[in-house]
Amino acid sequence: MSAYAALQKMSGASSILYGINGESDNDESGTIGYLRNSSDEEVEAEEAEVPTTSTMAPTPNIIRTPSIVPKINSFICESNFIPNDDNFIVFHDHIIIGLKANEYILINGQSKMTIQRGAILINTGHYMFAHPNNCIPIIASQSQSLPIISSTQVVDRSGIKDSKTDENMHLFSSNYKSIIKLENLYTGLEKIGTYHPPFKRLFYSHAVIEDEDLTEYERLFKTYSFEIILRDRGCIGISIEKLWLNQIQLLISDIHEDLIPKTIMIIGNKNSGKSTLSKTLLNSLILANQNTVSYLDLDPGQSEFSMPYCLSLTNHSKPIIGMNVPKVSGDEDSVSHYYGFTTPQSQPSQYVSIIKALFREYDQVYRPRGHHLIINTPGWIKGYGKELLNELTAFINPNQLILLSNNTDNDNMDNSDNLSGLTFQNSRCFQGIYQTSKYSPFQLRMYNKLSYFHQVDTLKFDFNSHILLRSPLKLSYETVNSSKDFKGINMVSVLNYDTGLNFELNDLLSMIDTSIMGLYLIDHEYYSSLKASLKKSEDCDYLPQYLNSTDYVNLINYSSSNNIFMGLCMVHSINTKDEFFNIYLPGHNQHRLTEMITKRDYKMLLVKGDGDIPSPDLLMFDMLLKQQEDLKRLNKKRKKNPNVDDKDVLKIPYVTFENKNKIGGIWKTRRNVMRRSHQR
């Protein structure tokens, strides 16, 4: 698919205003519009000629895999399970399902699953058996393919503990292979659609379902946090192809030949199935080893394992069914660092430095514990993206490098070009599965931001009230006139901006106001040694102290204990008269931050890269609707009396509801626009 076709199909740069149904208008003009920092931004960089390095890599072992192309169009779009009074038992907060041989269900929404009898296959590939203590959360959203739960034959009875109760006793017969229990799981994510209308179908919510469109059994799910897809409604299930399963089984067998933890890196073009394969491998290794697996996510654009604008190393001991929900900040079993951008090309040297630090953390802490490592990479394998891969593979030297491609023959010219110059011990080619999400990269990044700032605890989110209805945290900032024992925000920095070179210091507030910033704590002794390099202005003594981007790069040592990354904060506004920031940050992080500053005497640094606040958090949607309704009423009155004033109309700065003329007016803000005739 071309970049233009992808943009046409996946256009998701929704306006701050929406129609009555919460849907954004489509742009049907004949121009190519590129949204900055979308995952399609690297297209030009990929096409550019970049000299390859002359470093000779050791001759790797290339493992040939079958070149059979799986049938990627045979999607499963509905359950073949047919509910009745015998196999479908309904309770107020859970249901029990009996599956016969070869039956499966597609699950949409959020639930907790317990296997009560026998065994099941998840996504047609992951074998799990009954045990009362194995309660698995399922977070299934419309941004991804839905999980499939199918019955299967028990392989080994050892370890299986069936749960026979009065509720399911009649299902313990030869007619049924598997019994599962699905319980309600309300995390708060189901309410994100009321907070941001374009996400009203992202998670299952009975509030958006019309009764007249439902069958008798579908109507039962209106009291649950999940549903079973009983007929084709445009959903697609995750059905792992048999060829993938065979290749994964061979890979795991090779890994188990010795007891040394292995590193597996996955590369491929955009939308080729890297994240799906990474998660499939993660689940396969966890279930095969019953041991924790480490996961290094190198995609800063739309990762479900990292905070927005960050890169992370996380550890997982349970399989992930559906969407991964990151743990709250401060989790001791994960390491994150602020990168600041959504594409590696914005700060490539910083990008590589963070990845090397995260890999060292794995090498020194988690590899000795026996953790295997899975590395998921961005879809940028041409041009300068290839140069980054050259450097990263030379440093990591993965045991297994998996290339997702249209052709699984290693001798294929494109595959040979993609693998040339990379350092690895063994390589495999997997058939790519090319499927586009219903939601654009822009929308997925917005979801990541909203879920981060509205997360209350692990698997708990608050979208009941607007974030602006909460009082912001007031943090004083240090100026040239502050005392030596000042506690608060000691310095700020903007990546790629040095004073006198890229901007003037008196423009600083306009650069950081109303933005998302990374928050680092710096050891106070280390801070004292660099205080002389901070930029101050005697003429603007109300400004916070500024750290140049070049000094920031030298300051933050990602492998050092002198600095601690505390997550993200949202700068709502800056009061220059009283010298404080109004900020929002997740509630679970606020107490930890206060304790670190007051009791342990850390100094605080706020740093910004790309940091747009999501529009739903910037303005209250209800206020916009009220202004729109006020204007409608005013226009009706003015038709009868043109002299009616607008004193009763709610006024919001920088927002207008007046229609623009198509000719001579301004419809939309556009960036990097080229007409078709301008293409070369």
Swiss-Prot record:
Polar residues bias locations: 51-61
Chief site of localization: nucleus
Transmembrane segments: none
Annotated GO biological process: cleavage in ITS2 between 5.8S rRNA and LSU-rRNA of tricistronic rRNA transcript (SSU-rRNA, 5.8S rRNA, LSU-rRNA); rRNA processing
EC number(s) stated in the UniProt entry for this protein: 2.7.1.-
Family statement drawn from the similarity comment of this UniProt entry: Belongs to the Clp1 family. NOL9/GRC3 subfamily.
PANTHER family, alphabetized: CLEAVAGE/POLYADENYLATION FACTOR IA SUBUNIT CLP1P, POLYNUCLEOTIDE 5'-HYDROXYL-KINASE NOL9
Task performed by this protein: Polynucleotide 5'-kinase involved in rRNA processing.
Protein name: Polynucleotide 5'-hydroxyl-kinase GRC3
Provenance organism: Debaryomyces hansenii (strain ATCC 36239 / CBS 767 / BCRC 21394 / JCM 1990 / NBRC 0083 / IGC 2968)
Originating gene: GRC3
